[in-house]
Amino acid sequence: MTAYILTAEAEADLRGIIRYTRREWGAAQVRRYIAKLEQGIARLAAGEGPFKDMSELFPALRMARCEHHYVFCLPRAGEPALVVAILHERMDLMTRLADRLKG
């Protein structure tokens, strides 16, 4: 699988998912859910599995649904893919994503 790194914001997204899942459903569910998310992120970074090309919004941007979250990733030649956001399906995805891509 292709390597990837998380931006600080995506890392904060992941920490929030872990906290919420642990609080609501316990440690065992955290392990299961995060394992599925990590597999989905790795597939997206490698360009495998179903994903949506979001290049019209931002050059090379990819999006894939992983469980109840959407992952946004920028592949980079010769470097690990950059995960810019991991957002819950009920969030205003485009508004939150636009804020991330400005910087």
Swiss-Prot record:
Pfam family, one: ParE_toxin
Mutant lacking the gene: phenotype: Loss of this gene blocks plasmid stabilizing ability.
Molecular function in Gene Ontology: DNA topoisomerase type II (double strand cut, ATP-hydrolyzing) inhibitor activity; protein homodimerization activity
Cysteine-cysteine disulfides: none
Function (record text): Toxin component of a type II toxin-antitoxin (TA) system involved in plasmid partition. Acts by inhibiting DNA gyrase, converting supercoiled plasmid DNA into a singly cleaved linear form in an ATP-dependent fashion. To do so it probably interacts with one of the gyrase subunits. Gyrase inhibition is prevented by antitoxin ParD, and is reversed in vitro by incubation with ParD. In cells that have lost the plasmid filamentation and growth inhibition occur; this is suppressed when ParD is supplied in trans.
Family statement drawn from the similarity comment of this UniProt entry: Belongs to the RelE toxin family.
Something else known: Plasmid IncP-alpha RK2 is maintained at 5-8 copies per chromosome.
Subunit-structure text: Probably forms a homodimer in solution, interacts with ParD, possibly as a ParD(2)-ParE(2) heterotetramer, which neutralizes the toxic activity of ParE. The heterotetramer binds DNA, but not ParE alone.
Protein name per UniProt: Toxin ParE
Organism: Escherichia coli
